[in-house]
Swiss-Prot record:
Cited function: Endonuclease that cleaves only one strand of asymmetric DNA substrates thereby introducing interruptions into the template or coding strand.
Enzyme class: hydrolase
SMART domains cross-referenced by the UniProt entry: HNHc (SM00507)
Taxonomic classification: Viruses, Duplodnaviria, Heunggongvirae, Uroviricota, Caudoviricetes
EC numbers, comma separated: 3.1.21.-
Pfam family, one: HNH_3
Any one GO molecular function term: DNA binding
Keyword terms, alphabetized: DNA-binding, Early protein, Endonuclease, Hydrolase, Nuclease
Name by which UniProt lists this protein: H-N-H endonuclease F-TflII
Gene: hegD
Organism per entry: Escherichia phage T5 (Enterobacteria phage T5)
Induction of its expression: Expressed in the early phase of the viral replicative cycle.
Length: 193
């Protein structure tokens, strides 16, 4: 078999890939079989260090023949024609998650809405208040005293908005911090009033 168009896959040097998605094992001296994953993407399975490792073809191709810096990179590989089975090099584009999300949203006939994140100025969906990167993360620094203050003086809903957790998440956080039933705070309210 001629291997003139094949290139080494950097993360798996015992395997080679052609621009057409053929994967060759130098261990077994044969081409690997493509399989179809549950998401509809073709993949191959390598045997490395006693384990099976499955990797989708479009990421392997982008890694070796395009500008995907590594297989673990957070960059995504887009199929221009949206056909998951078309992994020809001219159909693959490496892009950021945000760019991929916007492209897919527009291709599906939805509008982005022209809204921008107030923190970083990235374009966001019309129903979003911030982009995913700027969305407030739950703070492990929330104390039981803070929760009690907001709930006693206002409500669970107001407390959850102020502290950046869902109402239910805040109740679970209170229980994990104190071991008490979150309803016990309401009992304090009735005792105070």
């Amino acid at each position: 078999m001629k291997l003139e168009n094949f290139k080494v896959i950097p993360e798996y040097p015992e395997y080679l890939i052609s621009p057409y998605g053929e994967v060759y094992s130098t261990k077994s001296n044969k081409l690997l079989t493509h399989h179809l994953g549950s998401a509809g993407y073709p993949f191959v399975t390598f045997y490395e260090q006693g384990k099976n490792v499955s990797i989708v073809l479009h990421r392997l191709l982008a890694r070796v023949f395009k500008d995907l810096p590594s297989l673990e990179s957070e960059l995504e590989v887009d199929h221009k024609d949206r056909n998951k089975l078309n992994f020809s090099l001219d159909n693959l584009v490496v892009m950021t998650k945000q760019d991929h999300r916007i492209k897919t949203t527009v291709e599906r006939g939805h509008t982005i809405g022209g809204n921008k994140c107030p923190y970083c100025n990235k374009q966001i969906n019309s129903s979003s208040k911030t982009c995913f990167d700027c969305k407030p993360k739950s703070s492990p620094d929330i104390t039981a005293e803070q929760i009690e203050y907001w709930v006693i003086n206002y409500s669970w809903v107001k407390a959850s908005k102020e502290l950046g957790l869902s109402d239910n998440g805040l109740r679970k956080r209170y229980k994990s911090l104190t071991g008490k039933d979150p309803k016990s705070i309401k009992k304090k309210v009735s005792q105070v009033g």
